[in-house]
Regions:
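Short acidic, hydrophobic short linear motifs in intrinsically disordered regions
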Residues: 79, 88-97
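A short, conserved structural fragment
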Residues: 114-124
Length: 152
């Protein structure tokens, strides 16, 4: 075999190794975490998810920290609770519900919520919690209340 053939064979082995299935640890060895819900806010919604506990710890922190930070202010939490309970709302209604005196304050908080995909603006300019986020957000609020000792 020539040097050229040796190099081709070596490259083929490397490609095969890269394309082969890597050893994947058992995703449930550390256990499973899950949540579910069925609610009637703005129509019937149902959601269920189960995910490996170890996998949860391996997900990148950036996106989840953005969501937690967006909810980490009392005004933003009030906006989210109001939107879940009442559906899509125009900015003036949100400002009133959150007890804000200026639209500048409201838009400051909405910017954080929209950037984290917790809230979206619909085609009419109103704001809403995306239907796919309603139950996960309710679970987060419930879990935070549990950690804070409010449910016991």
């Amino acid at each position: 075999m020539s040097d050229y053939d040796d190099r081709i064979a070596d490259l083929e082995r490397r490609v095969a190794a890269l394309e082969g299935k890597a050893a994947v640890p058992d995703p449930v060895a550390a256990g499973i975490v899950g949540y579910q819900g069925e609610v009637e806010f703005g129509g019937p919604l149902s959601w269920q998810i189960r995910f490996g506990a170890a996998g949860t710890l391996q997900l990148p922190d950036g996106p989840r920290v953005d969501v937690l930070a967006a909810l980490g202010h009392p005004v933003r939490a009030a906006i989210v609770r109001h939107l879940i309970a009442n559906g899509a709302q125009p900015a003036p209604a949100l400002s009133e519900a959150a007890g804000l005196r200026s639209t500048g304050q409201l838009y400051h908080h909405l910017k954080s919520l929209v950037a984290a995909k917790v809230v979206e603006q619909d085609s009419r300019g109103s704001y809403q919690v995306p239907p796919t986020a309603v139950i996960p957000l309710l679970v987060m609020l419930t879990a935070a209340s549990d950690v804070a000792g409010q449910l016991r």
